[in-house]
Regions:
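Alpha-helical scaffold segments
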Residues: 1-210
Length: 210
């Protein structure tokens, strides 16, 4: 068995095992750079699958279709063409949807702001800005709300002042307009109050220097 990275067709002619002879990738009209086990869509380890699609991104779209095993489709979706990624946004597999969100056009991912899976919503929040994130301000997932607090425009931040997560309020204390800082001045979390105090002190110093 050869150990050189080469095309599937060459390895087949070199006498590899049945798993390579029957490989659907090998039957494609275009060659793929692969290696059994370490750079293969059917590798036992996920790393080997991802390595294959990193080396052969053109196979991402072709191998994200439903007839492929889920673990193959999840890795393939990360390399799928952005226009095909739109079709994967409604895939039953949450990991495929999450990868599709990262590649699909922004206008296509808006409905997934209310996806049942928090991982998918996190991926959505990391791509959107401003008013597109308003409906995610009350998301039940803490990570989603933290991302939202860091990406909405500052004039929207007062809408999140009642959040019960101190991490969200820390972001608010750093970003919110100074006119709202007094609302957070008596926050139950010490470091939130410290951030507010630091900003207020700076504001007073700036006024005195003028």
């Amino acid at each position: 068995m050869t150990t050189d990275k080469t095309t599937c067709a060459v390895r087949h002619d070199s006498g590899l095992g049945k798993e390579c002879v029957d490989c659907r990738i090998r039957g494609a009209p275009w060659p793929a750079q692969c290696h059994p086990g370490s750079m293969c869509p059917f590798a036992h380890r996920t790393m080997g699958i991802h390595r294959f699609f990193r080396g052969n991104p053109s196979f991402g779209t072709r191998c994200a279709t439903p007839e492929w095993p889920d673990r193959v489709r999840r890795a393939a979706a990360a390399r799928a063409h952005p226009y095909y990624a739109s079709e994967l946004l409604h895939d039953p597999d949450r990991h495929v949807r999450r990868q599709a969100v990262k590649r699909a056009p922004l206008g296509q991912i808006l409905p997934l702001r209310e996806d049942a899976c928090a991982l998918v919503r996190v991926a959505v929040a990391r791509r959107l800005f401003g008013s597109d994130l308003i409906i995610m301000m009350d998301d039940p997932d803490l990570t989603v709300r933290r991302i939202v607090a860091s990406r909405v425009t500052t004039h929207m931040l007062p809408l999140m002042l009642g959040d019960n997560d101190p991490h969200v309020r820390r972001v608010l204390a750093r970003r919110i307009d100074a006119s709202w800082l007094t609302v957070l001045a008596e926050d139950p979390t010490a470091d939130v109050r410290a951030i507010v105090a630091g900003r207020l002190q700076w504001a007073v110093s700036a006024m005195c220097s003028d």
